[in-house]
Amino acid sequence: MSEPLKPRIDFDGPLQAEKIPPLKSARAFDTLEADNFAPARLVTGEEEEGAAEAVVESVLRPKRSLWRRMVSAGLAIFGVSVVAQGVQWTANAWQTQDWIALGGCVAGALIVGAGVGSVATEWRRLWRLRQRAHERDEARDMLHSHAVGKAKAFCEKLAQQAGLDQSHPALQRWYAAIHETQSDREVVSLYAQLVQPVLDAQARREISRSAAESTLMIAVSPLALVDMAFIAWRNLRLINRIATLYGIELGYYSRLRLFRLVLLNIAFAGASELVREVGMDWMSQDLAARLSARAAQGIGAGLLTARLGIKAMELCRPLPWIADDKPRLGDFRRELIGQLKETLQKSKTSPEK
């Protein structure tokens, strides 16, 4: 049997044809555009946080005012006048054979020379820290470049600055993995995968140890002044050790860039100490609650120490972070909590024995 015919369907309006988007014209890249081409990157939360911190830092950075320039010019003129007057005194003392005055001029010249040498050393260290930022920018450009021939010498210079010998196993593996036909991007990527993790692992161990010591010290110390002094000393020592690992010798002025985070860490220790004391006196909790508050305070200070170490790594590291190489604060938090729990358990079991 044949199937019955279906009823007719009437549409209210005419059917609209499916719109097909027009094809875009092809674009051909020349050699120069191909070398400078870089794919767009997705902005992650950490990058947004770093951008926000950069904006805040640029706002808080003091601007050069006219009064500051006038003071600098006045100090420069005063310094030149002192040097000229010293030369004149020395010449007069030599002509009049005033040996006491001549000895004083020589002593003053030695002191001024020592001061100039110290300033020159500080300037050289500050220039070295700024040069590390330029090297990091150069490495970032190489990671997006298809050129050949520059990356090997660049990476060898980084290894020499870090104090790695040519016979180091990581450096030998890197030499075995590269060849002349590889681009600069591939050579720098291999260096970041084979050699740089050796230094990063040492820096991570330094950060973990300093954070753990800060946590345990604050958890057991009853004095806020001792906490603040200990954190200041440990954080400054951590900055110096991380900079030394990456081949940078920090001076006074170059250390000022990181010293603000040290002050933040110190302020946190003192403020949290005050909050703990006031809160515990007001709530009249028992000794166990006090111990829990001390442990929480120690973990907070240890996390700030770890954050300081991560910031120091970012400033002293010669290569930018690639993929998931950047250490996360959550990893140190888990380590600190585990170490603190183990220490508290040992302290509870020891009196029972």
Curated annotation (Swiss-Prot):
InterPro entries: DUF697 (IPR021147), UPF0283 (IPR006507). Keywords: Cell inner membrane, Cell membrane, Membrane, Transmembrane, Transmembrane helix. It is a multi-pass membrane protein. It is found in: Cell inner membrane. It holds the Pfam family DUF697. Belongs to the UPF0283 family. NCBIfam families: hyp_HI0043. PANTHER family: UPF0283 MEMBRANE PROTEIN YCJF. This is UPF0283 membrane protein KPK_3110.
